[in-house]
Amino acid sequence: MKPSVILYKALPDDLLQRLQEHFTVHQVANLSPQTVEQNAAIFAEAEGLLGSNENVNAALLEKMPKLRATSTISVGYDNFDVDALTARKILLMHTPTVLTETVADTLMALVLSTARRVVEVAERVKAGEWTASIGPDWYGTDVHHKTLGIVGMGRIGMALAQRAHFGFNMPILYNARRHHKEAEERFNARYCDLDTLLQESDFVCLILPLTDETHHLFGAEQFAKMKSSAIFINAGRGPVVDENALIAALQKGEIHAAGLDVFEQEPLSVDSPLLSMANVVAVPHIGSATHETRYGMAACAVDNLIDALQGKVEKNCVNPHVAD
């Protein structure tokens, strides 16, 4: 008999078929307490779990005594209780490599669209305000040869640095847990402490996961240290930034603009002050949202679950020691 798994995110037909070749697949809409209660017998027998954008916590795991592996269609896993999973010897798989280039594209798009005010001036054109040759009130700022500060020099940070260095001749500063020799050799990137990065960068790009240590890492103190002409970009995790402090910094003119793909609460509230600011480009967590990349992530997650339930945890496993 095939192992039973629960799928809580729709998959393309070919990937669903691949999953069904290995498992008995039960599809549910979400992982809410009501859904779990209504499908208690299925959850009690499931050995695998696959999906995204749902919380997997100790309360859910209590309902899934046979669970051996869970696979998320994402690189981030802050909605998973890793300690609870590990304590129960449940493997957690994710998709860290598939989306690197696409998220770096999104970051570069935010850099360009904020600096050149693309969204703002496009809306002005649509509103019929372009009635003569444009003047300084339509101008943006240059990107080329400006200093880019990257906070978090992982795979995505490296891909962003490549674009900025070779495509836009931007000097690169970075702050990370350790020196990154490859970044320094390939892009002439300079490691510095966070305060120095904030003070010297024209663009500050935040690419950090959410952990206890990074929660609200950026607040009023950090924004006050940035140039008044600086542009802040976040495509990591929303709660790494104190959003109220960001709003205040923008309102007071402590920073020039912001390009945001992530927020403390998602979806972003329609009454958020960020949405009324012309110097803010706010997009709905589109970092990896292309047809090609989202398919690749789903395919990777399917393969990850197959591997995990076969005891193969050489790659893409958050807690591989569980398999020891």
From Swiss-Prot:
<keyword id="KW-0520">NAD</keyword>
<protein>
    <recommendedName>
        <fullName>Glyoxylate/hydroxypyruvate reductase B</fullName>
        <ecNumber>1.1.1.79</ecNumber>
        <ecNumber>1.1.1.81</ecNumber>
        <ecNumber>1.1.1.215</ecNumber>
    </recommendedName>
</protein>
<dbReference type="Pfam" id="PF00389">
    <property type="entry name" value="2-Hacid_dh"/>
</dbReference>
<dbReference type="InterPro" id="IPR036291">
    <property type="entry name" value="NAD(P)-bd_dom_sf"/>
</dbReference>
<keyword id="KW-0521">NADP</keyword>
<dbReference type="InterPro" id="IPR023756">
    <property type="entry name" value="Glyo/OHPyrv_Rdtase_B"/>
</dbReference>
<dbReference type="GO" id="GO:0016618">
    <property type="term" value="F:hydroxypyruvate reductase [NAD(P)H] activity"/>
</dbReference>
<dbReference type="GO" id="GO:0120509">
    <property type="term" value="F:hydroxypyruvate reductase (NADPH) activity"/>
</dbReference>
<dbReference type="GO" id="GO:0030267">
    <property type="term" value="F:glyoxylate reductase (NADPH) activity"/>
</dbReference>
<feature type="active site">
    <location>
        <position position="266"/>
    </location>
</feature>
<feature type="active site" description="Proton donor">
    <location>
        <position position="285"/>
    </location>
</feature>
<dbReference type="GO" id="GO:0019521">
    <property type="term" value="P:D-gluconate metabolic process"/>
</dbReference>
<keyword id="KW-0963">Cytoplasm</keyword>
<dbReference type="InterPro" id="IPR050223">
    <property type="entry name" value="D-isomer_2-hydroxyacid_DH"/>
</dbReference>
<dbReference type="Pfam" id="PF02826">
    <property type="entry name" value="2-Hacid_dh_C"/>
</dbReference>
<dbReference type="GO" id="GO:0008465">
    <property type="term" value="F:hydroxypyruvate reductase (NADH) activity"/>
</dbReference>
<dbReference type="GO" id="GO:0008873">
    <property type="term" value="F:gluconate 2-dehydrogenase activity"/>
</dbReference>
<dbReference type="GO" id="GO:0051287">
    <property type="term" value="F:NAD binding"/>
</dbReference>
<comment type="similarity">
    <text>Belongs to the D-isomer specific 2-hydroxyacid dehydrogenase family. GhrB subfamily.</text>
</comment>
<comment type="subunit">
    <text>Homodimer.</text>
</comment>
<dbReference type="InterPro" id="IPR029753">
    <property type="entry name" value="D-isomer_DH_CS"/>
</dbReference>
<comment type="function">
    <text>Catalyzes the NADPH-dependent reduction of glyoxylate and hydroxypyruvate into glycolate and glycerate, respectively. Can also reduce 2,5-diketo-D-gluconate (25DKG) to 5-keto-D-gluconate (5KDG), 2-keto-D-gluconate (2KDG) to D-gluconate, and 2-keto-L-gulonate (2KLG) to L-idonate (IA), but it is not its physiological function. Inactive towards 2-oxoglutarate, oxaloacetate, pyruvate, 5-keto-D-gluconate, D-fructose and L-sorbose. Activity with NAD is very low.</text>
</comment>
<keyword id="KW-0311">Gluconate utilization</keyword>
<dbReference type="InterPro" id="IPR006140">
    <property type="entry name" value="D-isomer_DH_NAD-bd"/>
</dbReference>
<dbReference type="InterPro" id="IPR006139">
    <property type="entry name" value="D-isomer_2_OHA_DH_cat_dom"/>
</dbReference>
<dbReference type="GO" id="GO:0005886">
    <property type="term" value="C:plasma membrane"/>
</dbReference>
<dbReference type="GO" id="GO:0005829">
    <property type="term" value="C:cytosol"/>
</dbReference>
<feature type="active site">
    <location>
        <position position="237"/>
    </location>
</feature>
<keyword id="KW-0560">Oxidoreductase</keyword>
<dbReference type="GO" id="GO:0046181">
    <property type="term" value="P:ketogluconate catabolic process"/>
</dbReference>
